[in-house]
Amino acid sequence: MGVSWVFEAEQTAKSVERILEGIGAELMGQFQVDVIPYNPATPSTDYATNIVMHHSKCPQSTFSICPKTDFRVSPKAVCDRGFDLILGKLAGGLVIDNAGKIEINGNEYNIHSDWTVRVGTATQGTTVKGVVVEVEYDPTVIIVQCREMMAEFIKQVFNKYHETQPEIFKITEKPERYSTLDTMWQYLQIAAKLRKKT
């Protein structure tokens, strides 16, 4: 996994896919991301909602984040899929919020070997909430090495979205390693916005 930039697109998934196919992208398969809130059984300001996420690129992993004010201070973990089974046993403390679950399903494209672009339709239950695009630059895991190039790629391909960089791009000035949790944080933030859409 390289460095990813996730954003909500204003176009339909088909429109985005046509843009990608127009620049020579090859369809590689499908992808799925889900974002599932687990709320405290009794409302409390002491305990935060735990967000459990899965990404088809990491099929044996579960990502868990308790969102706070920003990424750096939010408790987070990467677990194996057995974590989902443990959550079921914690029903006395954490209750799954099925109504708040966001699923993103779509297609994965490869562009000139170095770029992977995932385009998916986000749904909450049976309601379509929007289109989410993940642009991944595969050759590096260091944000400062590729963030300007990624902004240029997004500007050239989509002619927009390049000015709203992900939070992790803005707060990283040193050559730190990017991880899948950074990608999942971006999906979490987008899912929170999508839930509020009517």
From Swiss-Prot:
GO cellular component: mediator complex
Molecular function as annotated in GO: transcription coactivator activity
Localisation per UniProt entry: Nucleus
Key words, A-Z: Activator, Nucleus, Transcription, Transcription regulation
One of the protein's GO biological processes: regulation of transcription by RNA polymerase II
Tree of life domain: Eukaryota
Family, similarity comment: Belongs to the Mediator complex subunit 20 family.
Biological role: Component of the Mediator complex, a coactivator involved in the regulated transcription of nearly all RNA polymerase II-dependent genes. Mediator functions as a bridge to convey information from gene-specific regulatory proteins to the basal RNA polymerase II transcription machinery. Mediator is recruited to promoters by direct interactions with regulatory proteins and serves as a scaffold for the assembly of a functional preinitiation complex with RNA polymerase II and the general transcription factors.
SUBUNIT field: Component of the Mediator complex.
Protein name: Mediator of RNA polymerase II transcription subunit 20
Organism: Caenorhabditis briggsae
The encoding gene: mdt-20
